[in-house]
């Protein structure tokens, strides 16, 4: 059986920045270092950081006053920021800059008393943080996941309306909802460029290009990773068997019975070393040759948080 490796795959610039932020903070600050929420949605990465002394918490209420705390790549609400300030925490913000961009758009809508529609998955930490940017008493923010949700929605002022999206959604699915939004509310405003991040788009494009060449897909990523689940869905929608794994032990020999070509990709929060471990496991259960599938080369880099750059002396505080 041949293995085709999708390109690009794995860590994006926002995840790399978040993980590096935690590792560098461990070097420059005294333990313990607290992180609100999983810094990225990958069990292997989180477990590795726990072993290095990171304490993961659900809320800043669990962090002692004056302690060191890091916000995850998914971002937080204004209430969480205020709670952290009251506790006088030494705060490092690892929010992905592309999520921060979405936050700015929602805050601007709030400041203009515009109602806001957010396309995203209920309960996802990024969505919670984005919803929590809205403060207007005159307007409101609404969360929708589908065109069906949109059809049920009642807006007070369609002429003062803004939309935003979670960054890790399916590009195809979101385009349909956005078009439906524009059809229903012709005067709706939104970001100049769609909020779906470059890494999400690139990884989905890579899978689509590979689909006609494979008959089974393995996506390296955790079950709670939104973007990893979207990659898996692209294959299943085309009738191709697809599996989401974050541990080599999860690989099942039966997946590859009568299969000729296995595609392998990884969500934006899955490290390359884990991809290689899973490829090795696939090779153990069936004879394979591995080939890189040509794709987009990513060269995006996000600098570390300003406070951290100041502490380690690698950059000027702007």
Curated annotation (Swiss-Prot):
Keyword field contains Iron-sulfur: yes
UniProt family annotation: Belongs to the IspH family.
The keyword 4Fe-4S appears for this protein: yes
UniProt-annotated binding residues for isopentenyl diphosphate: 41, 74, 124, 225-227, 269
Cofactor binding remark: Binds 1 [4Fe-4S] cluster per subunit.
Name of this chain's protein: 4-hydroxy-3-methylbut-2-enyl diphosphate reductase
Function: Catalyzes the conversion of 1-hydroxy-2-methyl-2-(E)-butenyl 4-diphosphate (HMBPP) into a mixture of isopentenyl diphosphate (IPP) and dimethylallyl diphosphate (DMAPP). Acts in the terminal step of the DOXP/MEP pathway for isoprenoid precursor biosynthesis.
Binding site for [4Fe-4S] cluster: 12, 96, 197
Catalytic activity: isopentenyl diphosphate + 2 oxidized [2Fe-2S]-[ferredoxin] + H2O = (2E)-4-hydroxy-3-methylbut-2-enyl diphosphate + 2 reduced [2Fe-2S]-[ferredoxin] + 2 H(+); dimethylallyl diphosphate + 2 oxidized [2Fe-2S]-[ferredoxin] + H2O = (2E)-4-hydroxy-3-methylbut-2-enyl diphosphate + 2 reduced [2Fe-2S]-[ferredoxin] + 2 H(+)
UniProt pathway: Isoprenoid biosynthesis; dimethylallyl diphosphate biosynthesis; dimethylallyl diphosphate from (2E)-4-hydroxy-3-methylbutenyl diphosphate: step 1/1; Isoprenoid biosynthesis; isopentenyl diphosphate biosynthesis via DXP pathway; isopentenyl diphosphate from 1-deoxy-D-xylulose 5-phosphate: step 6/6
Origin organism lineage: Bacteria, Pseudomonadati, Pseudomonadota, Gammaproteobacteria, Thiotrichales
EC number assigned by the record: 1.17.7.4
Residues where (2E)-4-hydroxy-3-methylbut-2-enyl diphosphate binds: 41, 74, 124, 167, 225-227, 269
Pfam family, one: LYTB
Keywords assigned: 4Fe-4S, Iron, Iron-sulfur, Isoprene biosynthesis, Metal-binding, Oxidoreductase
UniProt GO BP: dimethylallyl diphosphate biosynthetic process; isopentenyl diphosphate biosynthetic process, methylerythritol 4-phosphate pathway; terpenoid biosynthetic process
One GO molecular-function entry: 4-hydroxy-3-methylbut-2-enyl diphosphate reductase activity
Cofactor: [4Fe-4S] cluster
Residue positions binding dimethylallyl diphosphate: 41, 74, 124, 225-227, 269
Active site residues of this protein: 126
